[in-house]
């Protein structure tokens, strides 16, 4: 049987004439019904596409990442059980290639979101209680690379692959943990959700967010993101959902991470 191509609606054109499995939104737990069902899989796309391919592939997986999610080189897939995020053990890709042609055409919003994702991989692990000498060195390398705000999408994807290697060493912590309820409850994209806490976290850690991100853009995104949260959903309920993710406790913030601390980070 021919290879199965796992793609998104925007990357399906690169698999013309092939058998395809199209990932249209965040990955449901239902994907486990076809775990290890295909001998050879090729993935072209971002994190959700590659996470799906890692679950489906049985023998060989070739990945062409188009964002900086780093999923090709991590050892788990993110799946959703309703509004709850779960990490499912999965394989790493056998081959990872960055094709410049597949990386063109990303919207400015997707470019920004994927930059946020790899930045969060570096920050979450750099300040993790589980960080090692090796992981800290890689975190710092990624942050230095990201100081180039004008790098091409293909270069950003390469940096994202380093981020995948990083989170295979040390699990993500604060930013990722806080983002999951925003994605699960309101369908706010992963990178967008994390961007809301960047300025507050950088202020707390005495880091200059302007080194990596445009201040005006961050401010406007926070305003837009707050508008996506329904008024009838109380802040206390949202904070309760955020605090359920134990991984946030591994972040070395200097004091206990409480609802009040999270409110300050998000400017709520």
Positions of PLM-derived features:
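C-terminal charged capping/lid subdomain of soluble metabolic enzymes
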Residues: 5, 211-268
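ATP/NTP phosphate-donor binding region
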Residues: 1-40
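Carboxylate- and glycine-rich phosphate/diphosphate-binding segment that chelates Mg2+/Mn2+
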Residues: 79-170
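Active-site segments that bind and position negatively charged phosphate/pyrophosphate groups
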Residues: 129-221
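Glycine/threonine-rich beta-strand-loop-alpha-helix active-site module
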Residues: 30-103
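Glycine-rich beta-alpha junction loops
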Residues: 9, 68, 101-102, 123-127, ...
């Amino acid at each position: 049987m021919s290879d199965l191509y796992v793609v998104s609606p925007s990357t399906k054109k690169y698999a013309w004439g092939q058998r395809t499995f199209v990932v249209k939104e965040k990955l449901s737990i239902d994907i486990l019904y076809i775990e290890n069902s295909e001998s050879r899989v090729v993935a072209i796309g971002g994190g959700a596409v590659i996470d799906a391919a890692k679950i489906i592939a049985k023998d060989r997986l070739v990945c062409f990442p188009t964002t900086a999610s780093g999923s090709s080189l991590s050892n788990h897939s993110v799946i959703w059980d309703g509004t709850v995020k779960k990490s499912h053990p999965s394989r790493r890709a056998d081959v990872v290639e960055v094709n410049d042609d597949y990386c063109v055409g990303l919207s400015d919003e997707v470019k920004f979101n994927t930059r946020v994702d790899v930045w969060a991989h570096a920050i979450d692990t750099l300040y993790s209680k589980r960080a090692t000498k090796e992981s800290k060195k890689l975190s710092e390398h990624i942050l230095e690379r990201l100081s180039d705000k004008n790098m091409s999408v293909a270069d950003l994807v390469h940096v994202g692959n380093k981020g995948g290697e990083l989170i295979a060493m040390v699990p993500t912590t604060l930013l990722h943990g806080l983002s999951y309820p925003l994605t699960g409850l309101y369908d706010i994209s992963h990178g967008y959700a994390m961007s809301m806490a960047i300025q507050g976290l950088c202020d707390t850690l005495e880091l200059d967010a302007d080194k990596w991100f445009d201040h005006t853009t961050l401010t406007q995104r926070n305003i837009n993101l707050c508008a996506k949260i329904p008024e009838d959903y109380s802040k206390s309920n949202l904070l309760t959902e955020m605090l359920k993710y134990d991984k946030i406790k591994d972040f070395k913030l200097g004091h206990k991470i409480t609802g009040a601390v999270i409110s300050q980070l998000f400017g709520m």
